[in-house]
């Protein structure tokens, strides 16, 4: 399943990010991918050795950690260090699959259950640049407003189509979820959404408390901590 997460960054935050990224040092995006991905990857990424990168990636982590919908959908256990990429002048990233595990500065290694793209460019400012994801439900093409994020299973084949006008800038990361199984995670997300909807409509009652108890018991049964 794919989950759009709106408003991870405010318009003011996006504008500030874009202004700072104009001053960033950009390097060949192939430096952070494996042999298979390098064959189809043609973009640029912010140099992770720069002081600016360290500040911006911390801000992205803070933003997603404070976003309730992101937490409900991902149930994150470990977040990778966010990276930043840029596409322009027909740059693209062909179909590829993300690595199953990644190194992590604190945890050593993490499993990649979910991938996330945080859009930092207004969709009207560039042509092309859609994130295309193939999963069991078909093919999805995603081009969200700046400040919005999309979550999708890391096991999915995906690509970024060529940017034929303008510049597409985004941040991206991987998540190891407390719930390894996509279907179980999707069920918990749907249950959580329905509980929140019922609470807003009817307030607290015994039936909602029973559903909340069910949610937490399922989370307790399925989670890997």
From Swiss-Prot:
<dbReference type="InterPro" id="IPR005123">
    <property type="entry name" value="Oxoglu/Fe-dep_dioxygenase_dom"/>
</dbReference>
<dbReference type="InterPro" id="IPR044862">
    <property type="entry name" value="Pro_4_hyd_alph_FE2OG_OXY"/>
</dbReference>
<dbReference type="InterPro" id="IPR006620">
    <property type="entry name" value="Pro_4_hyd_alph"/>
</dbReference>
<dbReference type="InterPro" id="IPR023550">
    <property type="entry name" value="PKHD_hydroxylase"/>
</dbReference>
<dbReference type="Pfam" id="PF13640">
    <property type="entry name" value="2OG-FeII_Oxy_3"/>
</dbReference>
<dbReference type="GO" id="GO:0005506">
    <property type="term" value="F:iron ion binding"/>
</dbReference>
<protein>
    <recommendedName>
        <fullName>PKHD-type hydroxylase YbiX</fullName>
        <ecNumber>1.14.11.-</ecNumber>
    </recommendedName>
</protein>
<keyword id="KW-0560">Oxidoreductase</keyword>
<feature type="domain" description="Fe2OG dioxygenase">
    <location>
        <begin position="78"/>
        <end position="177"/>
    </location>
</feature>
<keyword id="KW-0479">Metal-binding</keyword>
<keyword id="KW-0847">Vitamin C</keyword>
<dbReference type="InterPro" id="IPR041097">
    <property type="entry name" value="PKHD_C"/>
</dbReference>
<dbReference type="GO" id="GO:0006974">
    <property type="term" value="P:DNA damage response"/>
</dbReference>
<dbReference type="GO" id="GO:0016706">
    <property type="term" value="F:2-oxoglutarate-dependent dioxygenase activity"/>
</dbReference>
<dbReference type="GO" id="GO:0031418">
    <property type="term" value="F:L-ascorbic acid binding"/>
</dbReference>
<feature type="binding site">
    <location>
        <position position="96"/>
    </location>
    <ligand>
        <name>Fe cation</name>
    </ligand>
</feature>
<dbReference type="GO" id="GO:0006879">
    <property type="term" value="P:intracellular iron ion homeostasis"/>
</dbReference>
<keyword id="KW-0408">Iron</keyword>
<feature type="binding site">
    <location>
        <position position="168"/>
    </location>
    <ligand>
        <name>2-oxoglutarate</name>
    </ligand>
</feature>
<feature type="binding site">
    <location>
        <position position="98"/>
    </location>
    <ligand>
        <name>Fe cation</name>
    </ligand>
</feature>
<feature type="binding site">
    <location>
        <position position="158"/>
    </location>
    <ligand>
        <name>Fe cation</name>
    </ligand>
</feature>
<dbReference type="Pfam" id="PF18331">
    <property type="entry name" value="PKHD_C"/>
</dbReference>
<keyword id="KW-0223">Dioxygenase</keyword>
């Amino acid at each position: 399943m794919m989950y759009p997460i709106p408003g991870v960054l405010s318009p003011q935050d996006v504008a500030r990010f874009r202004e700072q990224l104009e001053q960033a040092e950009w390097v060949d995006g192939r430096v952070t991918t494996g042999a298979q991905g390098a064959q189809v990857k043609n973009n640029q990424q912010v140099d992770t050795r720069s002081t600016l990168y360290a500040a911006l990636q911390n801000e992205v982590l803070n933003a997603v950690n404070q976003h309730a919908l992101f937490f409900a959908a991902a149930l994150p256990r470990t977040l990778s260090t966010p990276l930043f990429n840029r596409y322009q002048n027909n740059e693209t990233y062909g179909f590829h699959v993300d690595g199953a595990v990644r190194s992590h500065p604190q945890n050593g290694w993490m499993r990649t259950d979910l991938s996330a793209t945080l859009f930092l460019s207004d969709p009207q400012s560039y042509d092309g640049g859609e994130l295309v994801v193939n999963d069991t439900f078909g093919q999805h093409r995603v081009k969200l407003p700046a400040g919005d994020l999309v979550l999708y299973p890391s096991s999915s084949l995906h690509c970024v189509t060529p940017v034929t006008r303008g510049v597409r800038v985004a941040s991206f990361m991987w998540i190891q979820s407390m719930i390894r199984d996509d279907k179980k995670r999707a069920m918990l997300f749907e249950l959580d959404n329905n509980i929140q909807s019922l609470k807003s409509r009817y307030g607290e009652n015994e039936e909602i408390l029973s559903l909340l108890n069910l949610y937490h018991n399922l989370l307790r049964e399925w989670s890997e901590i």
